């Protein structure tokens, strides 16, 4: 390797010893008889100090020729001293320029000179050199790692379902069509039907982390056309509340994992991530509509709670319940997909829920209808043709246990967890209504 240590690995035990560091030139300072380089790597900053009388002359002459963002390797002796900004410095014995950076730069990776979001996204490779931006993606990595840890500890089996499909998952029109040889196909908007089919196999508890594609023309700060979904499904449940319990445990596990393992990144972001109030409050759809009515927002029964309503409800729950996260459940059947089970004694209401995070829906789930004949009827009620779902329905004809699950939007979880205003900030190369490159 060209480096022996990251910046964060240089400790007092290395004082007086030789190391090799590598990274990008963040700053060069020339004070005549002494020159400085600050090198940035993934873990932080290293100060290189070059006194004219202590370093080879070729190094001393090379330093002023360095540009910001040149990639260099420095080999030298570690010197811990209170005179150094970071508490230590490296006295160089060798300096190699690996790659020169063009000037001017498309944006300032230190963030001192602000850039518009579009400029940043057009130059994402350089945007991530900003420690704040990099911290977001280190935390994103932790979210996915913690998610997998949680599911394995809970006895779940990871699956991978097709992303090229022949049938709309929920019968909607928000699909990206594509040509699949001589057939018409679509990009998958959800693994819903496939994870339900897995409940007929005996795997019992499955999860998937993968991309979903939705051809929604929304151009908002919380919508993406390609996003990552965390999906789970489990068999032999008695009610949707067991699924809500599972989702609550997952969210708490992920947040606490980030709090424990990403202290440095949270500090860079200047953000204090608190453990949510638990248990998460649970309010029915009817109760949510009553609260909104008291706040002057009327929503006809049976309709989805719109963005304004979600925001009002989020503010109310925070101020009155101290809750950032809360469930809304027992939705009108007409507002939810065909595969959600209805209440026997009140079929106009179904066993569905949403999880809201400060006024933004981050997850939907519920108990599924596992009885074949009723499921077929519910497909018809939505104006869909059961023949289009034959591959899915077959799994319900040969022994299907009661089951339920959820889909959790990874980007929405991360943006709300870190209180980031635009969902495009938490995905590397966002795909939205207007952005297809890079």
From Swiss-Prot:
Record's catalysed reaction(s): tRNA(Asp) + L-aspartate + ATP = L-aspartyl-tRNA(Asp) + AMP + diphosphate
Major localization listed first in the record, in broad terms: cytoplasm
Region called Aspartate, residue ranges: 192-195
Keyword hit for Cell inner membrane: no
Cellular location(s): Cytoplasm
InterPro entries in UniProt: Aa-tRNA-synt_II, aa-tRNA-synth_II, aa-tRNA-synth_II/BPL/LPL, Asp-tRNA_synthase_2, Asp/Asn-tRNA-synth_IIb, NA-bd_OB-fold, NA-bd_OB_tRNA
CDD domains: AsxRS_core, ND_PkAspRS_like_N
Cofactor(s), by name: Mg(2+)
Binding annotation for Mg(2+) 3: 361
Positions contributing to Mg(2+) 2 binding: 361, 364
Record-level GO cellular component terms: aminoacyl-tRNA synthetase multienzyme complex; cytosol
Protein EC: 6.1.1.12
List of residues binding L-aspartate: 170, 214, 364, 368
Keyword ATP-binding: yes
GO biological process: aspartyl-tRNA aminoacylation
Residues that, per the record, bind ATP: 214-216, 222-224, 361, 409-412
Spans through the membrane: none
Cofactor binding: number and manner: Binds 3 Mg(2+) cations per subunit. The strongest magnesium site (Mg1) is bound to the beta- and gamma-phosphates of ATP and four water molecules complete its coordination sphere.
First-level EC class: ligase
GO molecular function, one term: RNA binding
Annotated site residues (Important for tRNA discrimination) in this chain: 85
NCBIfam families, alphabetized: aspS_nondisc, PRK05159.1
Its biological purpose: Catalyzes the attachment of L-aspartate to tRNA(Asp) in a two-step reaction: L-aspartate is first activated by ATP to form Asp-AMP and then transferred to the acceptor end of tRNA(Asp).
Family: Belongs to the class-II aminoacyl-tRNA synthetase family. Type 2 subfamily.
Quaternary structure and partners: Homodimer.
Protein known as: Aspartate--tRNA(Asp) ligase
Organism of derivation: Pyrococcus abyssi (strain GE5 / Orsay)
Chain's gene name: aspS
């Amino acid at each position: 390797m060209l480096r022996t240590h990251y910046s964060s690995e240089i400790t007092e035990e290395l004082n007086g010893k030789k190391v090799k560091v590598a990274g990008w030139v963040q700053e060069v300072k020339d004070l005549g008889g002494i020159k400085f380089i600050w090198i940035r790597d993934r873990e932080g900053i290293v100060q290189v100090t070059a006194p004219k009388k202590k370093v080879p002359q070729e190094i001393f002459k090379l330093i002023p020729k360095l540009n910001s963002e040149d990639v260099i390797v420095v080999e030298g002796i570690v010197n811990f001293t209170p005179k150094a900004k970071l508490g230590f410095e490296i006295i160089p014995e060798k300096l190699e320029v690996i790659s020169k950076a063009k000037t001017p730069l498309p944006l300032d990776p230190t963030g001192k000179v602000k850039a518009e979001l579009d400029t940043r996204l057009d130059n994402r490779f350089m945007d991530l050199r900003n420690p704040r931006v990099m911290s977001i993606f280190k935390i994103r990595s932790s979210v996915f790692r913690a998610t997998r840890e949680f599911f394995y500890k809970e006895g779940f089996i990871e699956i991978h379902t097709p992303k090229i499909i022949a049938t709309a998952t929920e019968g909607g029109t928000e699909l990206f069509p594509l040509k699949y040889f001589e057939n018409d196909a679509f990009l998958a908007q959800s693994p819903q039907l496939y994870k339900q089919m897995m409940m007929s196999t005996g795997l019992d508890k499955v999860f998937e982390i993968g991309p979903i594609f939705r051809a929604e023309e929304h151009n908002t700060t919380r919508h993406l056309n390609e996003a990552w979904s965390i999906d789970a499904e489990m068999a032999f449940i008695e009610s949707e509340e067991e699924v809500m319990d599972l989702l609550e445990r997952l969210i708490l596990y992920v947040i606490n994992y980030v709090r424990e393992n990403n202290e440095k990144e949270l500090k860079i972001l200047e953000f204090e991530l608190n453990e949510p109030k638990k248990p998460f409050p649970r309010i029915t759809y009817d109760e949510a509509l009553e609260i909104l009515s008291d706040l002057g927002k009327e929503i006809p029964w049976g309709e989805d709670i719109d963005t304004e309503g979600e925001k009002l409800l989020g503010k109310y729950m925070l101020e009155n319940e101290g809750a950032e996260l809360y469930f809304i459940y027992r939705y009108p059947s007409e507002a939810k997909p065909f595969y959600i089970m209805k209440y026997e004694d009140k079929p106009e209401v179904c066993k569905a829920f949403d999880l809201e995070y400060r006024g933004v829906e981050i997850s939907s789930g519920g108990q599924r209808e596992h009885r074949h004949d009723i499921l077929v009827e519910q497909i018809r009620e939505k104006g869909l043709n059961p023949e289009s779902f034959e591959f899915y329905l077959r799994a319900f004809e040969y022994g299907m246990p009661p089951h339920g699950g959820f889909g959790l939007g990874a980007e929405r979880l991360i943006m709300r967890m870190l209180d980031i205003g635009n969902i495009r900030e938490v995905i590397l190369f966002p795909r939205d209504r207007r952005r297809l490159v890079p």
